[in-house]
């Protein structure tokens, strides 16, 4: 295995997923009225409802 592959393998195996997420609400995409999409599952369910 080459040095670059060894480095990648080590960094992959040593990665930590503990702690706070890096995503911040101030960077979230917002609609023109300032709201954000906080309940996407509800929206998707409503879009898939069959109208009779």
UniProtKB/Swiss-Prot annotation:
Region ranges (Disordered): 1-52
Subcellular location, record wording: Spore core
Induction note: Expressed only in the forespore compartment of sporulating cells.
Key words, A-Z: Sporulation
GO annotation terms (biological process): asexual sporulation; sporulation resulting in formation of a cellular spore
Pfam assignment, any one: SspK
GO cellular component, one term: endospore-forming forespore
Mitochondrion listed as a keyword: no
Family: Belongs to the SspK family.
NCBIfam families hit by this protein: PRK03081.1, SASP_sspK
Protein name (record): Small, acid-soluble spore protein K
Species in which this protein is naturally found: Bacillus cereus (strain ATCC 14579 / DSM 31 / CCUG 7414 / JCM 2152 / NBRC 15305 / NCIMB 9373 / NCTC 2599 / NRRL B-3711)
